[in-house]
Amino acid sequence: MTSIRVAFSRASSAASAVAEIAGQMAGFRPALVLCFAADAQDPAQLAAALRQAFPPPVALAGCTTAGEIGPDGYTNDSVVAIGFAAADFTAATVLIPGLSAFDLADCQRRVEDTLHRSTLQREALGFPNSLAFLLVDGLSLREEPVGRAVQLVLGDIPVVGGSAGDSLHFRQTQVFHDGSAQSDAAVLALISTDLPFRVVKTQHFQRTDERMVVTGARPAERVVTEINGFPAALEYARIVGVPVANLDPMAFAAYPVVVRIGGSEYVRSIQKVNPDHSLSFYCAIDEGIVLSRAQGLDALANLESALARVEEEIG
């Protein structure tokens, strides 16, 4: 029996999707089920159905998405569930609500309590390895402060995760936690295991020498108003060679920008062009940041190379 099982459904109703997922996990006893779902299904109904299909002590976490990875690769309008076998994993989860009025002390208290529960589980079973999985409401604009708060408590425990989406509608993104779906919230799963693992970070982009200095911004809104002293969208369009009218999600994906931090490069994803020719970003941005135009590499080859290195390390 494998330690991790993936289930997939394209059913249009939450009940049918969860029934298919439960069927694909028949005979598999999970400690944790992570669920990623398009907003075609009702999130509240989906979360409730998952709890009915996987009752306690199974831990549940997940979020709505802007696309999923299914058996045939990238897809949309589907539900993906990942089960972690109880024989090899333990999991403790916690909801971090009220992100619009983010309370650092409350967040850290919740994480500390969850870390205590996770430590008791891990020590009882003798599992030596731990990681944290964090999902944040993608419209809350709170990924960075939540991530920092979590990492401060967890110390050397690696934190991975991302933002909830809603098929690029930008109306309501939700996280799942133990049978409920909530906006303005984050969910954290602390996972321990006796299996070896590595955290893998890949991005199929390479920095060029063409730079863009953020000379005007509204950091609280993640909006860049000026690049190199010119209206942001106009200057970005000039540099990448795309008409402003053609700047859409596909163009932003084809012509990404990166920032260099601590010797590593990180993509700063652009969301949209605003009527005043400013640019909205998906992540933290501020005046003075130097962005570089990046060029795309072979995504599949990049991923295969990264996984091959991990296989060499841990077998």
What positions do the PLM features span?
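Small-residue-enriched flexible segments
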Residues: 1-32, 36-53, 57-66, 71-315
